[in-house]
Amino acid sequence: MSFKVQIRRAAEVDIAEAQLWYEAQRSGLGAEFHSEVSRVIHRLAETPLIYQMVHRDVRRAVVHRFPYLLWYRVQGEDVTVLACTYAGRDPSKVMSRLR
């Protein structure tokens, strides 16, 4: 069964900003970051329940090779990506964005 993944506008902005930052560090690194995020999103469409639930109905998935997390919610057959944040960010500040 494949889940429908929707990405909130705020999460799209998070991803784009991180991608630009990585690209400024080294040419091509931004594309590598985007590719890793896309892999996680693909996994969410296939098996969203494998990732840890961290707050009420919110789960988080790790972006491999990069210190970023995708925060998301599963409701029925829908997955909504709420945010993409730096893994070292204070979790309490992240939680305020997930409502």
Give the residues covered by each predicted segment.
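Arg/Lys-rich, positively charged N-terminal/basic patches that mediate binding to nucleic acids
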Residues: 1-34
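Structural signal for well-ordered, non-membrane alpha-helices
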Residues: 19, 23, 38-45
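Basic/aromatic recognition patch in beta-strand/loop cores that engages polyanionic ligands
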Residues: 39, 46-78
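Short, hydrophobic secondary-structure boundary micro-motifs
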Residues: 31, 52-54, 93
